[in-house]
Amino acid sequence: MWRRWLCPCCSCCACFPFTADGEDNQKAMKSIRSVYKIGHGPSSSHTVGPYRAAKILGQRYPEADAWQVTLCGSLAFTGEGHGTGKAIRAALPGAEIIFNREEENLPHPNTMIFKALKDGEVIITKRVFSIGGGSIRIEGESPDEEKEIYPQNSFAEILQCCKQEGISLTEFIYRYEGEAVKDYLRMVWSVMQEAIQRGLKAEGILPGGLGVSRKAKLLFEMRCYNENADVTMNRLIAAYAYAVSEENADENLVVTAPTCGSSGVLPAVLYYMQHDRGFPEDEILDALAAGGIIGNLIRTNASISGAECGCQAEIGSACSMTAAALATLYGLNIDQIEYAAEIAMDHNLGLTCDPVNGLVQIPCIERNAVAAMRAISSVNLSRFLYATRKISFDEVVATMYRTGKDMDEKYRETSHGGLAQLYAAKN
């Protein structure tokens, strides 16, 4: 399952995983565009991915007059709460959705089996995996993403390149992505801001039956008596994170960062920095680029799927991306950026994915706010202690993946353990 990998710039070793299907995961990375996908909530792996799979297959087999889609693994256990069937039917109207909760030994915990029918006969069967962040893989086919554009696949290699050539992390990113990626990041940032602005105005109860009320507007408008600057900052950032997460839970438009369930962390911090601290948009876009490369490294070398590795893969990754983005915005050096991202992931290791009633609400919304504030703390530590660190970013990513694989499946987006189980037992 694991192999040893020799760091190109020192004598240390780190472990990197294989992909879910056993294929060696040491390969070039794709564009950061694949980390930031615009789509409707509440779950990138349970709505955005299945919708994309259904859309692709529907266009590929227009002769089909009916579709049957079987959801397995995490999709079967939490797909109803996440609205997976609704997402699939948006692309394949009238599709029959089957929840197979018995299937075991799946190649990926988010497995779908699409059957195209014509005149009552099955004409094609395709197995598709929703691998996190809205990305999919059709069995037997190459991934549906853009071309691989980075020859590097570890932070150690990126660090070596930047130091040898005397360039910053963002200069490194734009060298391979091209300046045109800024236009994409500008569009992404616009959608992120709109989600916050909608969420700060919205009120009422979120769908799904839990009776969870929206809280972003309350957080944004309510002040403590003699509230100091630190409390104000934390309150506003929490309000922005709640705003996006509540929009996501209400199935509105958000950006995966790197997933829908963790989509509130990064925009919350960057929105505060632009709108409350006055950082210009061009610098915000650079920060998004830095966060994107961190998310890219995690999805390439480990996983961003809660169903595969628990919430550490979603909120942990978002926290890590946000720490790197903020460190970049503050003008910290690449060693400090790496350490900020490492701290942020390190202190999310082991975080379980146990959504109550299979909805992306409890504890998901609150976790976005907490992770946003944790990212800021990670950056503050990295400013002063980066020269004393013992663990690399690559090593903590490998640890996260191994921890996720060791985790019992009831803590990996099945709603069979943790908070979900306790809540179900008392109701």
Predicted regions and their residues:
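Tryptophan (W) side chains
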Residues: 2-5
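Cysteine-centered motifs
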Residues: 7-15
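Conserved phosphate/anionic-ligand binding catalytic regions in large, soluble enzymes, centered on
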Residues: 36-54, 250-269, 311-319
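Alpha-helical support elements that line or immediately flank enzyme active sites
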Residues: 47-60, 267-278, 323-331
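C-terminal regulatory domains involved in ligand/effector binding and gene-expression control
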Residues: 96-227, 235-236
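Accessory "access/gating" subregions that flank catalytic or transport cores
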Residues: 193-297, 303-310, 418-427
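Contiguous, well-ordered alpha-helical segments that form the cores/surfaces of helical PPI scaffolds
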Residues: 239, 243, 264-274, 289-297, ...
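Functionally critical mobile loop/hinge segments
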Residues: 326-427
